[in-house]
Structures are given as structure tokens and as C-alpha cells.
């Protein structure tokens, strides 16, 4: 209930929120009834009737003190009450009087007992107990309990940086970040480089500067003691001669104790692998070395099989976050890499670089030496020549010297041939027995040791060898059935999901596999041929 009491006291006015069952007794306690106008009384009684009789949780207490049960507690008149009673009716409401503002706040939170001088401050504070967050961000949907917090959050989306450093003109989105940054200008540069005597305010800046010296030292090989010191500097520790903090050398370098005790282990890490910075983080599984501990940590996921980054759409997991970012573009359809020539977008940068080769001079004109057809790229030309190879009959095997010469693709360098191979091995390598399977411009140099089948790509040979080994690395998450190739798993999962991506343009019927659609389309092609016979009958 709101009560407006006006007077000509020291303050301009006072607005109080009071919970009271009997407003008559409250008016007798706070001020004489003769000093109140009838309109103020009607407002008090009307607002009081709208409140439940026992609603006390989350409401402030009265000025004179009131129990949570709702019954008023009598208090003797004070100087503040006398000042309130002496005010003239109709005075404008304003801030608290000096006697109230200088003292303890009179708006009390019934949940934690904290006091406030303003009703608006109490209302904002009560949101911490109720969990109310009425201010919603229109970009990401995050909600806030206070409007200034929403304004600070929206700067992350807009990129606004309204707080500028007067020393270096660097800008910040929040004032506390600016105040923290300004301390760096008043702080003396106490960290000096022992090689060039350059001073830095932070030890982090000194460590980054010292890495530049390490890269400049051409051909220098650091000893074990220098390697340990460099590792200590990376961990922001100052190291005296000897093992750091009493820890053994192998533990400080992140190595295995068993491997460290082997002969030649110290010599393996005693110096850098190249002219740059030494690599002191070594994988215990394969022996590969890294300059950063984070790189070693990511590399070890290859051996442990850890995939901490999961796709929220399909559940597929990845060992590195950039791989997950690239995968998410398959769901969102984002293509952030556009071609500057034709405007075509690509999800990955490597796909864009491969596409840019088609815009190079002469790349658009790749004629086929057999039929003269122009292909857009050399890869398209090789695929086109395979069609010619399948259409042509197989060349019978003749004398060892009658090897047919393959026509060269324009602009494509010939593959080197080893002079140590025997004629029989060379015939097998170049696919003499399977001339109809290999294109005339691209020999098949990857041969299966089990059945002798040849392939043009190493990946195709790897997939083929799963037939002999029985390996099925792609399991179905629904029924557990395993497959040797991922496309087979994709087709199988359509049986669980009911997806039918191949639609017949004639009748609109859907199919889960493309060959089923092609078989179905024969029905529509054969229907007109049967109609004359039916009419003759």
C-alpha cells in the first residue's frame, strides 16, 4: 500500500510503502488526521483493500516498525514523525530529508534484512531472491535483472568500446577493464631482458620477447640446463640452477620417467630440432616433439581417442574445436569463404583454394585428346577420360615391349617410374591386365597384395582392403550393425529415420536409395509403350 504524506518539513516529500491491516491506527501513529486531506485518506484505504490481508513476504516494513504477522507495533513519536506531521498538504515528493538520508535506510528486505533508502533500490534487490530477469537480449536471448547489465552485455554483439585510455588510445567495453588497464601505465618496467636490456612491465611480455631471441640464434644448441630454464620461464617461474622446486628434470619437462632413464634420452632433448626454439614437450607414444604443452595435449588425443567436442545437432564428436566449427557449417549452411571471381561460397578455406585453380589462365580449357571436349578442370578431364577407357575394349597383352603409350594430359606432369622394377611388376603396376579400368592419362599404381586389384588413389585401396581384413569401423548407433564404408552406414540409417531424399518427379514417390528411384522410373518410361497394345485388344 502506498501512502503519500506531504508537509513543510526539512525535506521536499516522502513516499513510503507500508503493509497495514488497519490504516486508521497507522494514521494515528504517524500523523494527526487533521493534517491529512480527504483525498489522501481515500487513496490509502482504496490501495489497502486491493492487497491480501496476510501478504507480507517480499513487502517492506512500516516506518514505525511492524511484525510480519501484520499487527502494528506501537512506537513513541520521534523527531522524524513530528517533521512529517508538520508538512503542508500538496507538497511535491522528493528525496529523503537529511535526517533520514544520513541515517539507516527505512525500506527493509524481509528475506535478508538489508535496508535501502529508496523503494526502487529495494525493488531491484528483491530480484536476487525471486530470480526475476525482465531484461532480455534480442540477439542471444540471455536475460538480466538490471538494465545496465543488459547494456554492457549488448556491447559484445555491437563491438562498441566507449571507454578510451587517454595514454595509448586503447578502447574497452567496460569501465573496470579501463581502470585495470590504466594501472599498467603507472607501473614501472621492472622486467629487463638480459640480452638486449629492454624493459617490460609484465613478465609475460618479457617471455614473448625472449622467444624472438631464441628464434634468432641460428645453429645454437641449448644444453639440458638451458632447456630446463626455458621450460621454467614458460610457466612464469624464476628458476635457480638445479631442478625447479625440487622436482626431477623428467617431470619438469613433461616426460615419462621410464623413457628418461633409457640411454640417449638426455641427448635427444638436449638441443632444438631446428634453428628456432627448442621443442621440449615429447609424446611418450610416438616420440613426436612439440614447442607448446597445449600442442602436445591436443596431439595425445590421437592415441587416447578422446573427443571432448560434441556436435549439438548430430552428436558427432571431435578432438579439436576448429574441426567442430567446420562441421557445424554443414548443419547451418554457412559458407564464409566466397570466391572473389564468381562469388561461389565454400565452407572450408581449402575448398576455396582448390576452386581458385579453375580461374587460373588456361585452367578453363582442358580439351580431351580423344573427343576434343573441353573440361573445366584437370580433375574433370581425368574423370572424363575414364569414361573413354570403360567404353574402349581391353587391349590384349602382347610382347613386353609393346606397352601402349598413355596419352598425356596437357599441363600435367608425368608420374616418375622406377627403373628398378621388373617388366612383370611394371605391367602389373600400370594395369596391363585391367586396361579397361584405368584411364589412359592416369595409371593405377596402388595394388592390393591379396587379390592384385589396382587403384588410382591410396584411400580407395585402404577401403578395399577392409574386404580382406573384415574391418567395419562405422557402427550404427541405433542397432549396432557395423559397416566398412561410411556411405553404407548413411544409407542404412535411413531405415531407422524413415528419410526418403530421392523423389520421383513424375509421381512424387520417395525412395531411400538412388538405385531404387532409377528402377522405379523405368515404370514411367514403359507405360506409354504398353498403351497401344492395350488399345488393340
UniProtKB/Swiss-Prot annotation:
Region annotation (Disordered) ranges: 39-98, 386-437
Record's keyword terms, sorted: DNA-binding, Isopeptide bond, Metal-binding, Nucleus, Repeat, Transcription, Transcription regulation, Ubl conjugation, Zinc, Zinc-finger
Residues in cross-link Glycyl lysine isopeptide (Lys-Gly) (interchain with G-Cter in SUMO2): 533
Pfam family, one: zf-C2H2
Cross-referenced SUPFAM superfamilies: beta-beta-alpha zinc fingers (SSF57667)
Ranges of Low complexity composition bias in the record: 82-98, 388-401
GO annotation, biological process: regulation of transcription by RNA polymerase II
The family this protein is said to belong to: Belongs to the krueppel C2H2-type zinc-finger protein family.
Protein purpose: May be involved in transcriptional regulation.
Name listed for the protein in its UniProt record: Zinc finger protein 775
Species the sequence originates in: Homo sapiens
Gene name of this polypeptide: ZNF775
